[in-house]
Amino acid sequence: MKRVLITGANSYVGTSFERWMQRYPDYQVDTIDMVDGEWRNKSFSGHYAIFHVAGLAHADVTNVSEEVKKKYYAVNCDMAIETAKKAKAEGVCQFIFMSSMSVYGESAPVGKQRIITAQTAVSPANFYGDSKVQAEKGLLELSDENFKVVILRPPMVYGKGSKGNFPILEKFARTLPIFPAIKNE
């Protein structure tokens, strides 16, 4: 039985992934909360992979203090790298990092198309995206034959009970008839 450890035990992605993994009895899923420093005292050994979804998101990137920015770098970058170093030292084989599409910068203007491929260069437009880029760089330096690093860059994460921008968009979609002649089902 392979053991997987999810960091960010109470996060939307972490709890959703944990529920999804219940379909696979050959995997044992453990979770750990990263809010306090107690995770540093927990053993990662015996886990095949760590899915690192702990992090900060949903900031108003246009109006934050330097203190808030520092906290984002401490959590999204420094803690991710520290967690990966601990995992590698304790024999974990794979570290899966939840990054963000924010590493690519702003979306295309309305009416324009922007296609992102594996060759698209990162170009973060704000501190949140940059905190993820810096984490990715530090994590990839740890990758070797025995310790694989996987970077996931999802677009907006949404679903029942999700936070962030999705509930706002959902509310607008219900109240503003943007496409009144189209029945969206």
Residue ranges and their predicted role:
Residues G37-E90, Y104-E106:
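NAD(P)H-binding glycine-rich loop region in Rossmannoid oxidoreductase-like domains
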Residues D30-E38:
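Rossmann-fold cofactor-recognition segment
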Residues R3-Y24:
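N-terminal Rossmann NAD(P)H-binding glycine-rich loop of SDR-like oxidoreductase domains
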Residues T7, I50-A54, F95-M101, L152-P154:
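SDR active-site strand-loop-helix element
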Residues Y73-C77, R114, P124-V133, M156-G159, ...:
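Short-chain dehydrogenase/reductase
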Residues S123-V150:
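Active-site Tyr-X1-5-Lys
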Residues L142-I151, P155-E185:
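NAD(P)-dependent short-chain dehydrogenase/reductase
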Residues I81-F127, V150:
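Conserved Rossmann-fold NAD(P)-dependent oxidoreductase catalytic core, especially the SDR/UDP-sugar
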